[in-house]
Structure formats: structure tokens, C-alpha cells
A protein has these predicted regions:
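Gly/Ser/Thr-rich helix-start
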Residues: 36, 45, 54, 75, ...
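A short, N-terminal "cap"/entry segment at the start of jelly-roll beta-barrel domains
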Residues: 1-42
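Short strand-coil-strand connectors
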Residues: 41, 79-83
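Short acidic-glycine-tyrosine-enriched beta hairpin
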Residues: 82-99
């Protein structure tokens, strides 16, 4: 029996390890827009695997969307308004829209 298209395993959704901004050769995290691939339209869900020495994005602030992260394993740092904050497994971080809080 085939599983419905809205059930998936994260390993089946990972994109290639080539994410970078146009004009930059800096490799970013390995990720995937899982929500979009599963057909979700009102909530964005992304998987991000953050290798040592990389970041998820360039610094930015959310204007329309809210952003939320949850650390499953490892000890990444989150950059917020120029300051690094250590995270550990089980930590959450949330960025409400319209606050001007810059992060990566």
C-alpha cells in the first residue's frame, strides 16, 4: 500500500548541499522546504542541517513571516543583532515579524 503524499521522512526531502546566495560561493545549511513539498500553503516548515562553520542565511529581519527554530542535536550559535548566543538540544528560538530583530 502506498503512503499518502503528505507523509514523508526527512531524509527523502533534503536538498543538495549547494545552497548559496547569488554571487556568493559561501555554502549555507543543507535544508529543504518540507512544508511546501508536503502541500502546506499557510505554514512554512523547513529542515536545516547546519554543518560546522556554516550559517542558515545572511542576517535578516522578518517583516511579514514569523520564524521559529528548534535544536534537535548539536550546539549551534544564533546571531541576533550582532551578538552570538549559544544554543543546545531542546532550545527554541522565535522571531516575530515586524520587530526588526536581525538574525541568522
Amino acid at each position: 500500500m502506498n503512503r499518502p503524499s503528505f507523509i514523508g521522512h526527512y531524509l527523502d526531502f533534503l536538498d543538495d548541499d549547494d545552497a548559496h546566495y547569488p554571487g556568493s560561493d559561501e555554502l549555507l545549511s543543507i535544508g529543504s522546504a518540507v512544508g511546501k513539498k508536503l502541500g502546506l500553503k499557510k505554514i512554512g516548515i523547513h529542515i536545516e542541517t547546519l554543518l560546522p562553520g556554516r550559517r542558515t542565511s545572511w542576517p535578516h529581519a522578518e517583516s511579514e513571516e514569523e520564524e521559529f527554530g528548534f535544536v534537535i542535536e548539536g550546539n549551534p550559535d544564533v546571531w541576533i543583532d550582532g551578538t552570538l548566543h549559544a544554543l543546545k538540544p531542546g532550545d527554541f528560538v522565535a522571531f516575530p515579524s515586524g520587530t526588526g530583530i536581525a538574525h541568522t
